Amino acid sequence: MLREALRKAAAGEPLSEGEAERALETIMEGGASPEATAALLTALRVRGESVQEIVGFARAMRRFAARVRAPEGVVDTCGTGGDAKGTINVSTAAAFVARGAGVVIAKHGNRAATSRAGSADVLEALGAAIELSPEQVSRCIEEAGIGFMFARTHHPAMRHVAPVRAELPFRTVFNLLGPLTNPAGARRQLVGVFSAGYVRPMAEALEGLGAERALVVHGRDGMDEITVTGPTLVAEVGGGGVEEYEISPEDFGLSRHAPDGLLGGDAHLNARILRDVLSGEERGASRDVIVLNAGAAIYVAGKAPSIEEGVRLAEGSLESGAALAALERFVRVSRRLAGRGA
């Protein structure tokens, strides 16, 4: 099967969803050489991955994932990463603000690849236990209302791909698959992407994979989040189609900020900024971008009828202390489940 997929990809022909799915199954079963895997990923990158190929790859990767139990309506705020902007960990912080507003979160994430601090790095710096088993994550979601699924732990078959990805000097389809392969099966998502060109394709892929409601976003400043420096492109999935529009911070009563106000650093600095926002000590650009993204997550969860109402609930989560309490409970529960004490 992989040989035929390679032939078609090398000829510039698109793979069907089923062909892409079977090709990745072969790779993740260890049935492909590193050279064949690299050739396929390179050919797809040169031509540009189609929505059908992305969906097929995601279906295969989901099948090999270590599953996590979570209630209906659970939300993920995992993005693609890779915007190389050096900003704070917005989606990680937004997850705790949304949790403080009553949203159940199954956060999928990893260590940094192109930035200095990924979600796993920051959560670890905050004191959380991040390398929990699928059963432990399921219990964490049940007890704390939020769980973190470390990609390396929950996608063990990626060991057949990781060395090849490390050798290739460019992004591949796998940079898109993280948000599409949540091990808890989240069907409500806020997904940031690193390029405006992927906003609609990712939304169409999510629709093809059965998303109930999702927002795919890309800041005009290049952020893979909803930005507060200017407009953000949005593709919304839900209601039987994909709707594209643009939003700005002023639409939600928030200020526009200079890009420098969103800069972070290593995991420890980003963890400190996250905690400062959640505790109410930081009220500038960092707070506003976290509130806006949390508001979008609250809307995606169905807890608010609009992003604007979601932003109001996000502000309430911060002001009441619920967001900080959500972080502290997550750290405490994750450590106990990992056997590290409270």
From Swiss-Prot:
Reaction catalyzed: N-(5-phospho-beta-D-ribosyl)anthranilate + diphosphate = 5-phospho-alpha-D-ribose 1-diphosphate + anthranilate
UniProt EC number: 2.4.2.18
Chain sites annotated for binding Mg(2+) 1: 91, 225
HAMAP family: TrpD
Organism of origin: Rubrobacter xylanophilus (strain DSM 9941 / JCM 11954 / NBRC 16129 / PRD-1)
Keywords: Amino-acid biosynthesis, Aromatic amino acid biosynthesis, Glycosyltransferase, Magnesium, Metal-binding, Transferase, Tryptophan biosynthesis
Record has Cell membrane as a keyword: no
Any one biological process term the GO annotation gives: L-tryptophan biosynthetic process
Origin organism lineage: Bacteria, Bacillati, Actinomycetota, Rubrobacteria, Rubrobacterales
Cofactor note: Binds 2 magnesium ions per monomer.
PANTHER family (UniProt xref): ANTHRANILATE PHOSPHORIBOSYLTRANSFERASE
Gene that this polypeptide is encoded by: trpD
GO molecular function, one term: magnesium ion binding
Cofactor(s) needed by this chain: Mg(2+)
Protein name: Anthranilate phosphoribosyltransferase
Positions of 5-phospho-alpha-D-ribose 1-diphosphate binding: 79, 82-83, 87, 89-92, 107-115, 119
Enzyme type, top EC level: transferase
Main function: Catalyzes the transfer of the phosphoribosyl group of 5-phosphorylribose-1-pyrophosphate (PRPP) to anthranilate to yield N-(5'-phosphoribosyl)-anthranilate (PRA).
Residue positions binding anthranilate 1: 79, 110
Complexes and interactors: Homodimer.
Gene Ontology cellular-component annotations: cytosol
Pathway(s) the chain acts in: Amino-acid biosynthesis; L-tryptophan biosynthesis; L-tryptophan from chorismate: step 2/5
Pfam families in the record: Glycos_trans_3N, Glycos_transf_3
Keyword Cell cycle among record annotations: no
Binding site for Mg(2+) 2: 224-225
